[in-house]
C-alpha cells in the first residue's frame, strides 16, 4: 500500500488516480498515524513552501516523515514535496524545510526564459537510478515551478534539467529518499513508469 500524505497542498488526487491506473493500491490521508504499515509514502504538493511546512508541522507529518525514513521506509516527494525535503527555502522569505536532504530551495533568475517554467522539458540522468529504471536518458517530463532545489551533496542528484541558464536538480535519490521536480502524474508513459518504479522498489 502506498500512503499519500494529505496536508492540503494540491495534486494528491491526481497522483492517487495515477496509482489506481497502474493497479497499485494507494490511500490518501491527513493522519500520520495511518502511515504505520506503509513502506511507501508519497509527499505531493502544489503551492507555497511556507504554508506547506506549517501544515506539515500542524498535522504531525514533520516528525512522522523523519521517523518513516529513519526506520527504512521509502519517501517520494513530487514538485513542492521535493522542495520541502531540503533544509530551507527562500520562497517569500526564509523557511525551514524538513531537512531530509541538505540544501536550499532557490528562485530562478533569468532574462531570457519566462518564469515559472511551465511545460515539457528533458532530464539528464546523473547516476544509476531506481526511479528512472526502464526510462531513456533525455526523456521529457511535465514541469510547473518557479523555484528549484540546490542540494549540497552531488551524490544525491539523480537527474538535472536545463532551464533559465542553469542545469538544476530535477530529481533526487538517496538512502530511500526519492524526489522529482516534475509531475509524473502528468508526464504520460514515462511519468507512470516513475511511479511504478517507486512503488516496486
UniProtKB/Swiss-Prot annotation:
Main location: cytoplasm
Enzyme active site: 79, 183, 185
Family matches, as Pfam families: GATase
Source organism: Chlorobium luteolum (strain DSM 273 / BCRC 81028 / 2530)
Catalytic activity entry: 5-[(5-phospho-1-deoxy-D-ribulos-1-ylimino)methylamino]-1-(5-phospho-beta-D-ribosyl)imidazole-4-carboxamide + L-glutamine = D-erythro-1-(imidazol-4-yl)glycerol 3-phosphate + 5-amino-1-(5-phospho-beta-D-ribosyl)imidazole-4-carboxamide + L-glutamate + H(+); L-glutamine + H2O = L-glutamate + NH4(+)
Oligomeric and partner information: Heterodimer of HisH and HisF.
Signal peptide: none
A GO-annotated cellular component: cytoplasm
Domain Glutamine amidotransferase type-1 positions: 1-201
Protein name (database record): Imidazole glycerol phosphate synthase subunit HisH
E.C. number(s) listed in UniProt: 4.3.2.10, 3.5.1.2
Free-text function comment from the UniProt entry: IGPS catalyzes the conversion of PRFAR and glutamine to IGP, AICAR and glutamate. The HisH subunit catalyzes the hydrolysis of glutamine to glutamate and ammonia as part of the synthesis of IGP and AICAR. The resulting ammonia molecule is channeled to the active site of HisF.
Keywords for the protein's UniProt record, in alphabetical order: Amino-acid biosynthesis, Cytoplasm, Glutamine amidotransferase, Histidine biosynthesis, Hydrolase, Lyase
Source organism, top-level taxon: Bacteria
Location(s), subcellular: Cytoplasm
Known pathway: Amino-acid biosynthesis; L-histidine biosynthesis; L-histidine from 5-phospho-alpha-D-ribose 1-diphosphate: step 5/9
